[in-house]
Structures are given as structure tokens and as C-alpha cells.
Amino acid sequence: VDMCVTSPPYYNLRDYKNSGQIGAENTVKDFVENLCKVFDEIHRILKPTGSCWVNIGDTYDKKRLLQVPSRFEIAMCDRGWHLRNEIIWSKPNPQPISSKDRFWGNHEKFFWFVKDVKKYYFNRDAILVPQAEISIRRMFSKNNMEKRKDFNASDKEGFAISSNSQDKHYARMREEMGIDKEFNYEELIKSGKCPTRPEFDTWNVPSVTYKGAHFAVYPPELIEKPILSCCPEQGIVIDPFMGSG
């Protein structure tokens, strides 16, 4: 197996009407232990190049946040997994809450674990994103440097570098990109010549519902990035909790 992507049942939130179900344990400690036993088996069948992505939310009990994701994260590392990233899934459309005495939570954790820190597969190019428009416009401006005071020399305002030096720098960039000084941002992105950057570790992805489907489905956008970056072409992805989405 090349990769695991899953979202296990959250602690003490839903009753799936199954005997011995995960998520209905008496304590958080027992819940985390049962979860880790599942991922012990994933670790066993995963290739040395493999990754394991786990989305898990937290639970309140008697006005206390139980810190389920943090407990799970530490327990996984104690059992031989290596944590590469902790992604924040920020939801612009979170579920309403009835509580009147706390902030409205709109995020969940998405952990990226690897089996071997020296061998894991990662395709960085698959998840590069375009630079922001304001950053791109700096490359095409005649002189975009902010005026700033040089407190080491005097109180006079000046440029960090000369406009001539900056023009030459950006001229080289434009030449390498094969783009004229006048440009349209949308057209630049379509051309495939837009400068890129690595994806951030906070992802703004709306939650979704599908008529007739499982009531806790993945937004396709949420798992697209992990699969594109961590699973080789024609690779095998497993979800031990049989999630749909």
C-alpha cells in the first residue's frame, strides 16, 4: 500500500449502532489506544515510501476541550510514526453550535505521518500554487520598493536598492519567464508561466454534503492535495474506515 487517507470516528460524537464501535469508549485514553491499534496495522502494510494522512476533530465534555487530536498525534509518534506536517483544515461554513460561552470552532486537524523519514514519497511540484497577484505585480512594476528609513545612517527616507538595480533584476525574471511587461494575472496563470510557491499548512476548504451519501463525507478538495503529493501514479490508497467522498 502506498498511502492511507482516512478520518476515523470522532470521540463520543456519533453512535453508529455497532457493538464495540470506535468512538464510544469510556475514556479518551481508550479511544486513542484503539485508534492507534488500527494504525499499527496500517504501518505494517505500508511501503517504506508510504504516508498516512489522518483527519480528526476534537470533542468537548463538561465544558472541557479534550485535546483528542493532540493526544492521538503524540501516541502515533510514540508508536513509530513520524509527523511531517500538522495541517489546519479551516472551514468557512462550520456547523452551528448551541454553546453561548465559547468561541465558534471552525477548524480540524489533518495529520501527515510517514513511515520512514528518509524514504517517503513526496511530489512537491504537484501542489505548487501561483504566487499572489500583488507579488506578481511587483515584478512588473517600474519601481515597487517601499520607501523606508535607514535608521542606521540617518533619518532620511530612501530605497533599499536603487530603482535601476531593481529594474534589471525584474527584467531578467520577465525575460526568463518569456513575458512582456504588460500582463493580465489570469492570463499569466493560464499560460503556466506564473511563479509558484509551496502550499501553506492552513487549507480553507468548505465542508460539503451529498444527497444520499454518508453524512461525514470528505470534500474532494481536502484530500486532493495529499493524494497528489504523496501517492505515486497508479499507487494504492487505503481508507481503513471505509470513508466516502
Residue locations for each model-derived region?
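Core catalytic lobe of class I
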Residues: V1-G245
